[in-house]
Amino acid sequence: ENRHHRENLEDIVRTRTLALQQALEWLERTEKELRLSREETIQRLAIAAEFRDSATAQHVQRMSHYCELLARKAGLSPERCDLIRTASPMHDIGKIGTPDHVLLKPGKFTDEEFGVIAQHAEIGYRILSGSDAELLKVAAVIAYTHHERFDGTGYPRGLKGETIPIEGRIAA
């Protein structure tokens, strides 16, 4: 009777183990699909934001790739590098708030026009900030600081050196 009971228990364990393995495989596939969907959505929204400015998908992909490489070179964790890679395509999302007559103007901007175009960093920050999601927090920082310069001549705040968040220094 003990033998029979043990065999029944072993059958139950095998069945449940198989069910758990299948559930785990399903979760892994679903998680991968969600991650890919999130990244593709971000890429497509970034392309849409830059569409009026003749930006291409290749620009967004290059930006993402170079930011990841620079983050790695800076010694950031693999998780942080991936976060920066995923968030960086949103750097110019604020351009959706820039009027066409300025954004699409050929040639050099007047001081006034430059002031208008420079607002895209703050607009992007306002669009992306306020989320609890780490990805959007990083994207907001990148949007706000990707035109800052190490010597303090950048915009919108004229930050200098180490006061520029690492994500912004990488994206610049």
Feature roles, as predicted:
Residues 2, 6-9, 13-16, 20-23, ...:
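Heptad-repeat alpha-helical coiled-coil signal-transmission segments
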Residues 29-172:
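Histidine- and acidic-residue-rich, metal-dependent catalytic cores
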